Amino acid sequence: MFMFEKPHGMRDTLPGLYEAKKKVRSTLTDLIDKWGYQFMETPTLEFYETVGVQSAIEEQQLFKLLDQDGKTLVLRPDMTGPIARVAASKLHKHNHPLRAGYAASVYRAQEREGGRPAEFEQVGAELIGDGSTSADAEVIALAAGALKNAGLHRFKIAIGHAGLADELFVEVLGNAERADVLRRFLFEKNYVGYREHVKSLPLSSIDKSRLLALLELRGGKEICAKAEEIIGISGQSLIQELEDLWDILEDYGCAEHIRLDLNMVSHMSYYTGILFEVYAANVGFVIGSGGRYNNLLGHFGSPAPATGFGLRIDRLIEALGIQEETSEADAVIFSKEQRAQAILFAEEERARGRKVVLQDLAGIENIDHMTKSFANVTYFIGARKEEQNG
């Protein structure tokens, strides 16, 4: 029946999953907080002309609506834009970096046959006002630490650079339209299509080899030397940036979790430098991503370098293999005669840190069905008190 249906892509979070999400969220936010990032909240609704236009999410994925004044609003499609807006308008007035954290849901319309959620929660951090490679390393190390704190140890963070492929494409192709075609193949990870398209281009065998060699630039720091052989002079500084980043991440103790992927292309068009994606060993999709976006705050009238990341709670739960949390609550069931004693007992147990449901016997139709979901049950009925352990 229609009354039980939900809008496409929207999902209910029932108690077991809610508890699992709460536990994972807490492990992430606890570590981000310990690194000195201050948490903030932004409105679910933003103006389309500000956050909506500046978002890197495709237009057809935005949820739009009109307010009473006829202005177009959007449900926030990501958190980077809203935090950039806040930082530009209210917070970035000091001559030192700003560290902001968040835990919030974002909204992106999905195709009906895709089966993907249109609403999902992200936990993340943004470092605004620091353009150094150390800042890039900090947010990557923080993302790695947060994942470990959540209990995930088998993961990789693939690191690339938004400008590296572009440098090669512009030098070899000299045409933005041609470059966009190759960039799309990389974004879709359609490497077969990429190779076939490169072979069809009217280029010298040397230039074709350079474009094809880009696909092989994955691995440790050693691939930077290979990159220097195919990237032109203008791209050498980008390669040096990646080498410096690797050295800093080694100091953080993150080397085992990182690898370079120099043909990485992101769907987030505002990235201007280092970018990265997080993969878990047992799932086949990205569970988090981030990167540097030095131009975004300028669109809000306060230019500043920035970098950050977001981790998806739903995908992290799947990567962790967490089952829905079962209730750890106790139940206290009472009759009228011992109501006062039952209330006192329940309050004492709660003060000790237990979760306690207090239930009048008169409100229960099937006592066996109700009590089987509780860890322990204590009865205050008639003249007696009786305990039943789960």
Swiss-Prot record:
Coiled-coil ranges (or none):
none
Please provide, in alphabetical order, the Gene Ontology terms of the cellular component aspect for this entry. Answer: cytoplasm
Classification via Pfam families: HisZ-like (PF21996), tRNA-synt_His (PF13393)
| Single GO MF annotation | catalytic activity, acting on a protein
Question: Keyword set for this entry?
Answer: Amino-acid biosynthesis, Cytoplasm, Histidine biosynthesis
| Family assignment from sequence similarity | Belongs to the class-II aminoacyl-tRNA synthetase family. HisZ subfamily.
Complexes and interactors: Heteromultimer composed of HisG and HisZ subunits.
Protein name according to UniProt: ATP phosphoribosyltransferase regulatory subunit
Q: Which organism is it from?
A: Bacillus velezensis (strain DSM 23117 / BGSC 10A6 / LMG 26770 / FZB42)
- Gene symbol of the encoding locus: hisZ
